[in-house]
Structure formats: C-alpha cells, structure tokens
C-alpha cells in the first residue's frame, strides 16, 4: 500500500527539517489562496519558514544550486500546505493545473 499524500508531505517536511503545519506567513498585502468552485488558486510562495526567508538571491550568482533546490522544495511545500490546511487532506487534490515561477 502506498503512503497517503499527507504522509508523503510529512516525510518531505521532515527531510528538509521544517514543519508546514502552522500558519503560512506571507510577506505582503495579498491573499495567498482564493477558492473558486472546485479550484484553489495559490500565489506568492517564497522560501519562507516562519518569518525567515531561508534562501535569497539568484542560483549560480548569489546562491548555490543546492540552496536553490532547498528553496524550490520550501516553496513547493508551502504551496501544498495551503490546500492541505483548507481541504484537510491532500488526498482531496485531484490535480495541479499550472505552476508558474
């Protein structure tokens, strides 16, 4: 039996050493999620954990490739944490329609 999406989420969170169970802080005056019909739009996810932006700068210039990978994981986990919180379970997510950077 494959692990649930929530279990996989928790495993990745443990691997990178951050919990995404609390409030997902945003850094401006915008709404991070908008629900419309059966879709959730998520915006503005940066590599922030709590009140700290963990990685800054351009990969290859101000930051390493490894730091860039960590930043991408944190952004992805933040983007998944929001529907997990609003829906209660990532198993309810049917598909991800689009990701833009």
Feature names for model-found ranges:
Residues 1-101:
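Short, polar/acidic, helix-capping and beta-turn segments at strand->helix junctions
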């Amino acid at each position: 039996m494959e692990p649930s999406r929530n279990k996989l989420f928790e495993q990745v969170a443990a691997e990178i050493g951050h919990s995404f169970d609390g409030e997902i802080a945003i850094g401006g005056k915008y709404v991070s999620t908008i629900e419309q019909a059966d879709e959730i739009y998520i915006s503005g996810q940066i590599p922030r954990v709590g009140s700290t932006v963990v990685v800054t700068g351009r990969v290859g210039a101000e930051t390493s490739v490894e730091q860039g990978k960590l930043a991408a994981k944190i952004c992805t986990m933040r983007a998944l944490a929001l529907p997990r919180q609003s829906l209660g379970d990532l198993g309810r997510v049917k598909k991800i329609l689009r990701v833009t950077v």
